[in-house]
Amino acid sequence: MDRISGLPDELLVEILHCLPTKEVVSTSILSKRWEFLWLWVPKLTFVMNHYESDLPIQDFITKNLRLLKPQVIESFHLQCFSSSFKPEDIKHWVVTTISRRVRELIINYCDLSWLDKPVVLLDLPNSLYTCTSLVTLKLIGHSIIVDVPRTVSLPCLKTLELDSVAYSNEESLRLLLSYCPVLEDLTIHRDMHDNVKTLVIIVPSLLRLNLPIDGAYSCDGYVIVTPALKYLKVPGLYREDFSYLLTHMPNVEEADLSVEQDVERLFESITSVKRLSLFVLLDIEDESMYHNGIYFNQLEHLNLHIYRDNWSKLLVRLLEDSPKLRVLKIVVDGEPSFDEEFEHVSWIYNDESSVPKCLLDSLEVFEFAGYTRRPEERDFVSFILKHACHLKSSSISRLSCYVLE
């Protein structure tokens, strides 16, 4: 301990910076020199659970947050699952961090008082929406409402996560996104009572979008206009009960998607993709179809998880339209189909010139999970092993022993 205390204050603060806030604060009892040293640490995390005594922590934050020495707070993270916290206190703390030019702000708040009385939602201060220093903002929890004022300016915000929050009206999210000129990473987990019917995401600068969609949510439609996007994750986007507009994304390199209908419109938007993960749940009559002329000339890695046994038509099209494919991983997770109208694809190619180009030129890894020894599956596996001239590894397994990566 004497050796550590002999270090200069600047180095001690750097060491404290790497520790959890609770441990950082506990160093204040070591000696008079250490008593206020923790106030120079620019990164703070407070975690309160419903089974803990919250009032001492509230008083501690209120008293000491304004005493912090750094001119810039690098990160303020508050995680609170409690009925004793007052939204006014959290709002005050946010105002204080904003006055210290906070760069990362994470508020995870759930008021557990809804179990026995109406919840008072946390309405964050207007100054949050004009914070010029903010680079990362994450708002998480059913007890937070996003009420965006008319004056918005977040010129440095690059990462935004909105998880299970409510919006004051239909325009709040659209207005917020409109004034984030350098936003690169956006995650939206919706709540079924979030007050948004048509979710509009128009962000020219966006590079990554994660938008899980649950069928239980009330929604009329989605509009996604993100021309610079490189990574797209949208499970459950294509459902029959809402409309959507998804514009072309010429820079997409990786996509992780669930498909329930309208494969064609989806594929038209992501033809530049290099790595594609698809969870497919299609009716028999929709099982294959996207029009000729859609090619995945850059696709190298395909993960295909199909929750139907009528998987072959879609797969043969993807093989034919992906000439550079190197890795093919398939999971078939569904009951056998006994529909007489369904016709399986023939995997017997008499003319080698009609064999998909990726098999002859590039495929190196092949994995098939959910194998049940049906004739079509045997024909398909034999077809791959026969024609994949550059295959380096292959795996055929039952579903129970396979994890798709």
Swiss-Prot record:
CDD domains linked to this entry: F-box_AtFBL13-like
Residues covered by the F-box domain? 1-47
The cross-references to Gene3D superfamilies, in alphabetical order and at most eight, read: 1.20.1280.50, Ribonuclease Inhibitor
Q: Where is the FBD domain?
A: 347-398
Q: Which InterPro entries match?
A: F-box-like_dom_sf (IPR036047), F-box_AtFBL13-like (IPR053781), F-box_dom (IPR001810), FBD (IPR006566), FBL13/AtMIF1-like (IPR050232), LRR_dom_sf (IPR032675), LRR_FXL15/At3g58940/PEG3-like (IPR055411)
Cystine connections:
none
Pfam (any one): FBD
Q: What is this protein's record name?
A: FBD-associated F-box protein At2g26860
Instruction: Please report the organism this UniProt entry assigns to the protein.
Output: Arabidopsis thaliana
